[in-house]
């Protein structure tokens, strides 16, 4: 069926409305006006533009109002609203001319549209019959363009649908020359990728479309060859005038004044193609005298290859596709083929060689010029390139950092500007991101929505729960590349790596001391401020850090929550467990650069360094005595304040140091863990074992500087030195007599008490 016959029928035939019952002229007029108003509201809703100034919230409100005016839920039922949506979709899938004509009849329902189209089909079939009988009888049967099946002539609707269902301009992304010049390279690449992706989506649906050149030709030198003076195809919208390079175009075989109608459609018969050559969707004039088929089969690997071999193609200027310019290249067989710089399937640019004909199994001729990944089909390459184009498309102008999403870039820029728009209403603290404010507010509300399924412990942040769960699983995903030590937290790995690099980026503004961890700096700064906000409820002792308070409270509770998996021994502190575990592994990864001595802990190495430097940073504020270790200062301060926090549960005796309490408890338990390998004698204290060993070896390491007399024990040397100094530190409180040794004082006190020495 020729398109002109369809146009004449649509122009002349005015069907009557399908009546649902008796209706007056006034009711018909009112119904027609109501339908026109409904159609106007629908168009206002569908064509509503996004107002840049008003903002998204106001735009959404306006769009919702337009939708209510169209669907009218206060009047229509759910079934009626559903019918309106189905009617709209049904009208949208009709062929272009039929859709326009049906819309002009203002149908009330989908059934009425069906009736209109069926009546139109019947009329066209009746007019088709006499035209088919009037065809010339000498048509050769072997004509490839001749269709002997009359049924195909009656399928006018499917032909129109094939030609009118989708054109490339329906899905094209139009830009102006000014937009193209302002585009960054990443967005230009995205524009090319999206355009080719739309083309391949249409090809995959079996639609006959002609492949555009993706790279815009706005900056290339063009000259006008021929203008199309007739009206454009209804499917196209006016664009800037496109021009072609003269050097690629042969002389046209038409008069310069002849006009070409882009809206003319054509079928397989090609009887009327002599006077005016057909024009494809991108302005190609086809002058092959044997004609061509719009619905010719396209090759799966090269959809334009078979079609391009049938005819010569000439480029004409038209008022359309400035942004999708087409170039030409002469082949060896004097045929003209399309190509573009975006490496199409029939270009050898993307695959490293000529890709012609069918691709053999296993071949992957299309490669990504970004990462080198290869693909068998070109649409797969296009989809892959689109991912590259979207990757980190937003760049910070301050530091050059790139982001994948615009929202991430906006949040990042607040680091440079210092903007903190999200403020806590309870304490006034401000944050740069809303998520940080949400997490902070849980401090005030006490909310802990994340719960550990193993132990039931609650957390305010998901990240804290994830870190905690590693204590149950034993997972340590972070590994040091230097010593292969693993950690459960990334922050622990970063802190550990500073042991190898020696980096100490955190500096105290008061004394200039540097630290490898920020927490250590915060702890150190409390020495200058003297602030101790954490208080024990049992003994009222105060601490500068909460961790110190927690450790101290375990003295009162006796809790030992850290257990060694090797021997089962339990400890109150995790650091003590770590120290103990090195006795099983024998690992000593911390080495002194001065003497080469190795240690199992970094703290021990730090303390050892002070023996070389003589540094004693911990000073007593009462007597001024300095110490190399903080624990020694803490123990010394108990001499001044009389504190003895370590108490024996058996006899009640108290001690200043926990080690002294441990040694004392062996008196009650009878434990003697230190055994001599020579005679088998056991001792409570390690110092007693060391003194006993000297009886076997004869070693006397302690020498008097006055008389050169040597001793096996340090206490014996101290007592001997009092002979030279005359010091008598042990005085009787009753008579005031002084003695050089404590044993002599004890014997003297029996004189006052009357006690006798037992033999």
Curated annotation (Swiss-Prot):
Tissue: Expressed in brain and at low levels in kidney and spleen and few hematopoietic cell lines.
UniProt-listed SUPFAM superfamilies: beta-beta-alpha zinc fingers, KRAB domain (Kruppel-associated box), Retrovirus capsid dimerization domain-like
UniProt domain KRAB: residue ranges: 166-234
Residue ranges of every copy of the SCAN box domain listed in the record: 42-124
GO biological process: positive regulation of DNA-templated transcription; regulation of cytokine production
Region feature Disordered, mapped onto this chain: 127-154
Keywords in alphabetical order: DNA-binding, Metal-binding, Nucleus, Repeat, Transcription, Transcription regulation, Zinc, Zinc-finger
Entry similarity comment: Belongs to the krueppel C2H2-type zinc-finger protein family.
Name of this chain's protein: Zinc finger protein 287
Native species: Mus musculus
